[in-house]
A protein has these predicted regions:
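Amphipathic alpha-helical and helix-coil boundary elements used as assembly
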Residues: 1-323
């Protein structure tokens, strides 16, 4: 949810720091204030000699939407606009599905996505003879001839180059160092880009319907069931083997349609909405050696129909419609 990290190093330990806001950063302990001076000067202090600020084109609006089957009429669309003063700022990015089910979640995620989109639009790059600038810390630049560049920055990337010329002949300095860096103005919200996407499934999977011991059907008011997947090494083939999973039917309307709840022990085919492993849905059933077709095959292959069977305790009662 917009959380990012960096390391703080000390002689005794290395600390992983997590934050989601610019005020979670500290000033560089040894260089909270740094001056700019022209390259080539020999000064008895560390300084920055090169810095260039830039503005980039960024989309100015982020729109997200999703669908919740428990509240199908809910309006979950969320829009956040934060355009920069550049060209193409009126463009928008539309994301579906947003992977949320409440308006509050949608507003938060849309804001974070917009901040991540806007964040790289204002950056500065530079270099200097300074060793104490560290990624994840802030400092304030001073003495630059362009007043707007003199401000507080967050160091989002640093690279330290060291060169030892002690074994070389000549009059060059025996030891030189330069730090290059990328800066983000602290007056702007810093939000890193998403570099990893949510894992997606590939194709449907086979599973066995499960439920409590002694039951033949285990469902809820939505007609959902629970299953155990073949790859699940730790499930116990019971009512806790999975989340509730929706079932697709040939016909479904408001108070009408076709319904047959998959029974415990039946093999079903489970696919995933939008490839999301958190949104399984049963899209079909299939026979296997334990649950064979209702009449002999291939001898009766020409017959088609529907065949029902009574639950436990109801005897061997069957009803069918054959074509």
């Amino acid at each position: 949810m917009g959380i990012y990290w960096w390391f703080e190093h000390s002689e005794n330990c290395h600390t992983l720091v997590l934050t989601d806001a610019i005020n979670g950063h500290k000033a560089c302990p040894d260089s909270p204030l740094v001056e700019w001076h022209q390259e080539g000067l020999k000064l008895d202090k560390e300084f920055i000699h090169t810095i260039t600020a830039s503005e980039r084109l960024r989309t100015g609006k982020w729109v997200m939407d999703d669908f919740d089957f428990m509240k199908p009429r809910s309006l979950l669309k969320s829009t956040v606009a934060s355009p920069r003063n550049t060209g193409h700022a009126e463009y928008e990015h539309y994301e579906w599905p947003g992977d949320y089910f409440t308006t509050g979640e949608g507003e938060m995620l849309t804001r974070i996505r917009m901040e991540a989109q806007r964040s790289p639009g204002s950056r500065a790059h530079g270099a200097g003879h300074i060793r104490t600038l560290m990624t994840g810390y802030t400092f304030t630049l001073m003495n630059h001839p362009t007043a707007e560049i003199n401000q507080e920055y967050l160091l989002v990337q640093t690279t330290l180059f060291l060169r030892d010329n002690a074994q070389h002949s000549g009059q060059d300095q025996h030891f030189t160092y330069v730090t290059t860096f990328e800066l983000h103005p602290t007056r702007e919200v810093y939000r890193p880009q998403r570099t990893l996407s949510k894992p997606h499934t590939k194709g449907p999977q086979s599973a066995i319907v499960t439920g409590p011991v002694g039951q033949e059907i285990w469902t809820d008011k939505y007609g959902r069931v629970k299953v155990q997947f073949g790859w699940d090494r730790y499930g116990n083939n019971d009512e806790n083997s999975s989340c509730w999973i929706r079932v697709s039917y040939p016909w479904a309307g408001k108070g009408f349609g076709m319904i047959q709840i998959p029974r415990i022990g039946q093999e079903v085919l489970v696919d995933f909405k939008n490839g999301d492993p958190d949104l399984p849905i049963i899209v079909g059933r299939t026979y296997n050696q334990d649950t064979m077709p209702p009449w002999g095959l291939p001898g009766m292959a020409s017959q088609s129909g529907i065949f029902s069977h009574s639950l436990q305790g109801g005897g061997d009662q069957r009803k069918h419609a054959a074509l």
